[in-house]
Structure formats: C-alpha cells, structure tokens
Amino acid sequence: MKNLKPKIEKVLVKTINDYAPFKGNYKAYMENNKVMVVDTDPEYEDKGEEWFFVPEYDHEEAYCFMCDGGYGWELVNPCEANYPSYDFEEDLDKNFKEAGLFCEPYSSWKHIVTEVSI
C-alpha cells in the first residue's frame, strides 16, 4: 500500500497557507505529525497551535487526518462552527483532488483519505 501521509500533510499545509482569509497572517507547518499554525503578527509571541493531526496508517488502520476541537475542527465542520464558511472545505477538497486523493468525513473529528484510482 502506498504511503499517503506525506501527501495529506502537504495538502493540509498548502490549503491553510493559501486560504485567502489567512494569507499573510498565519503560517502552517508540520511538526511531529501535527499541522501547526502560527500567527505571523510580530506583536504576538505565538508558538503555534495544533490544528490537525496526521497519524501513521497503523494508528487508525486508515490514512486520515484528525482534529479534536480548536479552529481546525471548525474549518472542516462549517455547519457546526461559530462563524460558518464552506470556502476552506471546498479549497481542501479541490487540493486533495489535485493531489489524486479523496477525502471524506468519518466523524466530526476524523477524515479518511484514499487515493483516487483512475
């Protein structure tokens, strides 16, 4: 089975960094299987906040990403967010598709990612 974890991480980081409301204000990066996001405003001493967790396949017996609360959870669950917007979810789906992947919610905190077979 092909390791999809690097692609999942790349898509999540790219989507956050390219998302219009965040562009220039936040920077996403990977650290220890976590998608961390830092506020780039020099006035804040932001050490980064975990928005998503991308486990190894063996952890969940599926390639996936998880979000247990926080702003990452709100972005992928817009119908339950305080300030709902479907734009991030649409951008994420588009970026997964461009990477040859398909993402579907398993639950509000876990999204399964599979490779698209053509």
Language model: regions and residue ranges:
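Charged, low-complexity intrinsically disordered tails and linkers
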Residues: 1-66
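Ser/Thr-rich, low-complexity intrinsically disordered terminal regions
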Residues: 31, 105-118
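Acidic, low-complexity, intrinsically disordered interaction modules
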Residues: 39-107
